């Protein structure tokens, strides 16, 4: 179990906090809007109303004690950048920040983010691949060249060994199968 600070409780931050709770992690959530904090109370250990661009407030949360700090602010890049930078200055161990554009990611990485996520881009890629390719049930992009696919077995593959399929001549592919 990890302790996670989620800053920003818009759609993305709220869903991250809910999933972390479902995975049994300890979650503290922070947002400047009281209604968002109130809505998060059922699925977080602790929730605070406050401005995370304020160093004193952010310091009062004990950011050094969290395994991961997730900056989920999506509607105000300046606040996201300031919060990311302050978290690192205050000793946060690992900071993940949300970006909408590559230029945002560059600034976030230069100012303290250990990693950057692009929720809209990542979901758009998953949706496009998942719903336009035959046999794909799920997809995880590892980088621009590699991905992991869960797929149904095409009829023409049934009863054949991996060697008989010769998938490596089509692309650099590794298969791992399991019965369900």
Describe each PLM feature range.
Residues 13:
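N-terminal Rossmann-fold NAD(P) dinucleotide-binding loop
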Residues 43-45, 49-127, 133, 152:
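Phosphate-bearing ligand-interacting subdomains
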Residues 173-180:
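Conserved small/polar residues in nucleotide/adenosyl-binding loops
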Residues 27:
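Short beta-strand element of Class I
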């Amino acid at each position: 179990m990890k302790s996670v600070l989620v800053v920003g409780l818009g759609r993305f931050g709220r869903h991250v906090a809910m999933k972390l709770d479902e995975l049994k992690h300890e979650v503290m959530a922070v947002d400047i809007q009281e209604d968002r904090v109130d809505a998060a109370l059922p699925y977080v250990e602790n929730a605070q109303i406050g401005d995370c661009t304020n160093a004193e407030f952010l310091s009062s949360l004990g950011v050094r004690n969290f395994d991961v700090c997730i900056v989920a602010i999506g509607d105000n890049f300046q606040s996201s950048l300031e919060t990311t930078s302050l978290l690192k200055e205050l000793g946060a161990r690992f900071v993940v920040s949300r970006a909408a554009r590559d230029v945002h990611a560059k600034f976030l990485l230069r100012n303290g983010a250990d990693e950057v996520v692009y929720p809209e881009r990542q979901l758009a890629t998953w949706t496009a691949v998942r719903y336009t390719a035959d046999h794909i049930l799920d997809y995880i992009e590892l980088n621009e060249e590699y991905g992991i696919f869960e797929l149904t077995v095409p009829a023409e593959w049934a009863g054949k060994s991996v060697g008989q399929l010769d998938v490596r001549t089509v692309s650099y592919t590794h298969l791992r199968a399991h019965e369900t």
